[in-house]
Swiss-Prot record:
Homodimer. Part of the multimeric pyruvate dehydrogenase complex that contains multiple copies of pyruvate dehydrogenase (subunits PDHA (PDHA1 or PDHA2) and PDHB, E1), dihydrolipoamide acetyltransferase (DLAT, E2) and lipoamide dehydrogenase (DLD, E3). These subunits are bound to an inner core composed of about 48 DLAT and 12 PDHX molecules (by non covalent bonds). The 2-oxoglutarate dehydrogenase complex is composed of OGDH (2-oxoglutarate dehydrogenase; E1), DLST (dihydrolipoamide succinyltransferase; E2), DLD (dihydrolipoamide dehydrogenase; E3) and the assembly factor KGD4. Its cofactor is FAD. This is Dihydrolipoyl dehydrogenase, mitochondrial. Lipoamide dehydrogenase is a component of the glycine cleavage system as well as an E3 component of three alpha-ketoacid dehydrogenase complexes (pyruvate-, alpha-ketoglutarate-, and branched-chain amino acid-dehydrogenase complex). The 2-oxoglutarate dehydrogenase complex is mainly active in the mitochondrion. A fraction of the 2-oxoglutarate dehydrogenase complex also localizes in the nucleus and is required for lysine succinylation of histones: associates with KAT2A on chromatin and provides succinyl-CoA to histone succinyltransferase KAT2A. The modification Phosphoserine is found at S285, S297, S502. It holds the Pfam family Pyr_redox_dim. The keyword Lipid biosynthesis does not apply. The keyword Nucleus applies. The active site is a redox-active disulfide bond. The record marks D448, Y473 as: Important for interaction with PDHX and activity of pyruvate dehydrogenase complex.
Amino acid sequence: MQSWSRVYCSLAKRGHFSRISHGLQAVSAVPLRTYADQPIDADVTVIGSGPGGYVAAIKAAQLGFKTVCVEKNETLGGTCLNVGCIPSKALLNNSHYYHMAHGKDFASRGIEMSEVRLNLEKMMEQKSTAVKALTGGIAHLFKQNKVVHVNGYGKITGKNQVTAKKADGSTQVIDTKNILIATGSEVTPFPGITIDEDTIVSSTGALSLKKVPEKMVVIGAGVIGVELGSVWQRLGADVTAVEFLGHVGGVGIDMEISKNFQRILQKQGFKFKLNTKVTGATKKSDGKIDVSIEGASGGKAEVITCDVLLVCIGRRPFTQNLGLEELGIELDPRGRIPVNTRFQTKIPNIYAIGDVVAGPMLAHKAEDEGIICVEGMAGGAVPIDYNCVPSVIYTHPEVAWVGKSEEQLKEEGIEYKVGKFPFAANSRAKTNADTDGMVKILGQKSTDRVLGAHILGPGAGEMVNEAALALEYGASCEDIARVCHAHPTLSEAFREANLAASFGKSINF
């Protein structure tokens, strides 16, 4: 394998970095102060300030492009930062602490508490404080990198023009060389069920409930469903998830991991009805909700009554009223914007990234696309391997994976070998009294190359990044097994699983 310095020199000789740095020296990055009736001139205009949009805007400015970012909401950061990834992680973390203190976990560690009370208002306040700090951080980064922020609903009104409609009805026109659509996604509605964000809620409403419901039904046991269901189950709700598929964890999860994950969640008190569909929901006079369900392929009907119904059946691209139809840009059958490998639409100077294009709807996938898309505008290469994009479920224990699952390898006819290591045999997990789960490695039988990594256990969301690095650079299971890992750490389980995959046996199990 080439050293990084040799790779860097090789790329430099090919002119990739020089084209980006020298080709843009004459481009100004100074923001313009304008009046509403005076157009802004820009090199790149990004519509949307979520993880893909704001990162793309900053990178574009760093490359020397005069950059504008248009955002319809009052705060920057998109769904992820305001009503998604970030606030949900705050609640997941704090609800886990409460669960440990309220249950027998603390007592088993010699920590005795006479009374544990939940102050939900304070918990929500901590969540909001974290969100506010991070949204303010993006605003600071925009100023630091000289990105012009326009608050308004962005619509493409020409091949080289974006018009932002502001809350007061005024408009701001931006004349621009390139347009990048990064408008993200929105909650997919459930046919026949109206979300009021009070008792029938989407993920947005579930992040701001005023009290812990006695009973909650979650439609969908994918990533968002199990995460938010876990929050309220830990805080005291009786939670049942109804899932059309026969497993929990959503698309891409390894089935062995999914089964073990479901078992652990059930042990915690989370209930599941798999291979089951919701046929309707009715609000009663007492405020409770009757949820009608039956088998996915038909069968006996049943009614579950709850205080809060959480709808988590996925998300859909947000592409409405962007002006795409007028430009002749047609959406695919799933409502996504078709793009080429450089993220260009059928109009070469109009690009799209993130949830509005094909691929997993993940914040970090959008970030990567945003960076390489604007590098491509500057003449650079646009490399991305979607097989190396990790997925994480932030419950406790966490679930994380990257690469292929066993089911995918079987379907593709690829011969593989498996290495496993349980956290019960890991010394750090033992000292933490947190031993549920395992690491599972899939390697190519003929070459030993890592094909997939699947982790169920403490710290899985951090550990999976080591696996992503291995996949990105084509590492073998032996490569990882021969890297010295600090002791005692949870990541030793990752090394041991690779030992098992490469040599047929781990050391400590």
